[in-house]
From Swiss-Prot:
Residues 115-164, 178-202, 399-427, 445-502 are annotated as: Disordered. It comes from Drosophila melanogaster. GO terms for molecular function: DNA-binding transcription factor activity; DNA-binding transcription factor activity, RNA polymerase II-specific; RNA polymerase II cis-regulatory region sequence-specific DNA binding; sequence-specific DNA binding; zinc ion binding. Residues 119-136, 183-198 have a biased composition (Low complexity). This is Protein krueppel.
């Protein structure tokens, strides 16, 4: 009997709660979701407010029977019995209310997600179509009573947050997959800017990603308007343009020589101070310029990277190759201003004395003196050829060169001036006439040196400029500033003092 009375009380309370919820939804135009009644007293009070002429229980019963159909009343009675038996609500929700399963229990689920007192009173709606904040759970967390404490419902909150994170991660993965499968071509994945491998640029590239690698065409983006030569930096282009304009803003305070670049002036000042900071690791020689040290190291390594295209001659320096090409071209760009005598090399002009016949040029170049291998001077070869031709003309009337390879010690004795002797000399000179002048070059040629390779690590060299202390003495020498023998710079202080004394 007591059980049936309790069931009736629960049924009436539930009916009153449903009536109160419906009445409040009508007043709020279904714009917000309200929390369900916290107890039977609040539901009865709301029913009494609707029916003030009746008592509390009578008002609740009248509102319940007036608002619900018989089927809904039976379902409410069964639900009250399920509460008493402590059965899960989810097992009865779909069968009792097939038209709207969350009509009764969704409000209680909203009550579970309410924050503690002192915070917001209502939960935000789950969707714009339903006034209920959250649908009923899947049954993993059964509810024993509508007045359960918030600690029992914290797992539900965590589950809700996790589900939101999973949905967010799913959306991100879908957006990444869509980006990789676009029809515009293969696109590299977005990079943080630290990987050098992210260098691809697709047709539909990422607008938000910053390019990591440089465009190869932009490595030398500064181009000279005169010679179309490209440079990687603006100040390098400005220094290069001075070679076209002839501007030399840097002046030496000692000899007032001007330069196009500041580091050329610094190197030139070492000639006045006598500083030679570059030391050879294989010998005790010191140099003013790093280019001179690099060129000197090729003497130890035996490297000759510059080859003549005409005679296959090899040289260790580009300036030596340029000077050698003057021999084939027959050019003598260095001219004396007084006697107008021309020379192929600058140091020949500097050592020239006007009014005095120049001595025969030695076979060894000053740049290579004391070093191995020996470079043969073309001027010495011509002078030797002329001397031997004069000897042949004196004794036999021949102008051809002497065959030095066939010479014997007997030839050093006194000449027989008799008729037989004269005929023998004539016959000997006639045989010499068949020889070519090239045979004499074979006498002075030495075999290539067998020197092991010596490694060397040197910095890069800039384009050459005349850094010596003397000024050019002729126009031809001024035009050949790039052909200057840079070995003379190391001996420039001594030569400068010598010219000052003369």
């Amino acid at each position: 009997m007591s059980i049936s009375m309790l069931q009736d009380a629960q049924t009436r309370t539930l009916a009153a709660a449903l009536a109160g919820i419906k009445q409040e939804d009508v007043h709020l135009d279904r714009s917000m979701s309200l929390s369900p009644p916290m107890s039977a007293n609040t539901s009865a009070t709301s029913a009494a407010a609707i029916y003030p002429a009746m008592g509390l229980q009578q008002a609740a019963a009248a509102s319940a029977f007036g608002m619900l159909s018989p089927t809904q009343l039976l379902a409410a009675n069964r639900q009250a019995a399920a509460f008493m038996a402590q059965l899960p609500m989810s097992t009865l929700a779909n069968t009792l209310f097939p038209h709207n399963p969350a009509a009764l229990f969704g409000a209680w689920a909203a009550q579970q997600s309410l924050p503690p007192q002192g915070t917001h009173l209502h939960s935000p709606p789950a969707s714009p179509h339903s006034p209920l904040s959250t649908p009923l759970g899947s049954g993993k967390h059964p509810l024993n009573s509508p007045n359960s404490t918030p600690q029992h419902h914290e797992p539900a909150k965590k589950a809700r947050k996790l589900s939101v994170k999973k949905e967010f991660q799913t959306e991100i993965s879908m957006s990444v997959n869509d980006m990789y499968h676009t029809s515009g071509g293969p696109i590299s994945p977005p990079s943080s800017g630290s990987s050098p491998n992210s260098t691809h640029d697709g047709a539909g590239g990422n607008a938000g990603c910053v390019g990591v690698s440089k465009d190869p065409s932009r490595d030398k983006s500064f181009t000279c308007k005169i010679c179309s030569r490209s440079f990687g930096y603006k100040h390098v282009l400005q220094n290069h343009e001075r070679t076209h304009t002839g501007e030399k803003p840097f002046e030496c305070p000692e000899c007032h020589k001007r330069f196009t670049r500041d580091h050329h002036l610094k190197t030139h000042m070492r000639l006045h101070t006598g500083e030679k900071p570059y030391h050879c690791s294989h010998c005790d020689r010191q140099f003013v310029q790093v280019a001179n040290l690099r060129r000197h190291l090729r003497v130890h390594t035996g490297e000759r990277p510059y080859t003549c295209e005409i005679c296959d001659g090899k040289f260790s320096d580009s300036n030596q190759l340029k000077s050698h090409m003057l021999v084939h071209n027959g050019e003598k760009p260095f001219e004396c201003e007084r006697c107008h005598m021309k020379f192929r090399r600058r140091h020949h002009l500097m050592n020239h004395k006007c009014g005095i016949q120049s001595p025969p040029t030695p076979a060894l170049s000053p740049a290579m003196s004391g070093d191995y291998p020996v470079a043969i001077s073309a001027i010495a070869i011509e002078a030797s050829t002329n001397r031997f031709a004069a000897m042949c003309a004196t004794y036999g009337g021949s102008n051809e060169s002497v065959d030095m390879e066939k010479a014997t010690p007997e030839d050093d004795g006194p000449l027989d001036l008799s008729e037989d002797g004269a005929s023998s000399v004539d016959g000997h000179c006639s045989n010499i006439a068949r020889r070519k002048a090239q045979d004499i070059r074979r006498v002075f040629r030495l075999p290539p040196p067998q020197i092991p390779h010596v490694p060397s690590d040197m910095p890069e060299q800039t384009e050459p400029e005349d850094l010596s202390m003397h000024s050019p003495r002729s126009i031809g020498s001024h035009e050949q500033t790039d052909d200057i023998d840079l070995y003379d710079l190391d001996d420039a202080p001594a030569s400068y003092m010598g010219h000052q004394q003369h």
